[in-house]
């Protein structure tokens, strides 16, 4: 199966070989599932990872029914042992050319109201899973002389907001982690990229609101489709870059935070306070 290419490939794009293998975490829904569909259509072999086996089975079957190549690895990314098991299974299957860390959890409300069990789960899935899997796959990619790690971050990393303290913090960590790795590996055929999407219209909002003591996330009204993020993942695999904003207009966010952060300091808590009063 040939990789999808433009008629003319810019010099900045990598030469993609037929049948490259991508591991996608959080593949049972949302950005992960949309990315699986996009990369399958581009001709990549997929190894899909998520906790919900029934969702993975359905997605794998759909991809195969359209001529794609996909296999599934149900796993709980909150557990160290499960991450090691994922890596070992991928190694036995021939290794990975691309690792897409897209698994993530959310929660909305005052951090002081956040149950520690929920906070710990978010740290394990949003941060530890991406860092641990990167530490497992990166040496393997170095031994092969090439590879690409894509981390799905969030614009929340660049504009910390009320109600998402730990989520913003987890994404800011990933942002700094990915940027540091990108600079360490500069000049090699190993790439690390971070995506900074705005709110994305997925069931993330429902699952976040359903967590203990959480509430509806107001940013949902501005959400974009998961397919736009998936297209950005494919774009950055073809043409590696350190960071990609989705949509591109969000590139102004760091400037807004630097220039108008004082306004967020004053207005930020108002929505949360109003929600608490209504409750």
Spans of model-derived segments:
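Substrate-binding pocket helix/loop in short-chain dehydrogenase/reductase
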Residues: 110-111, 118-123
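SDR active-site lid
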Residues: 184-250
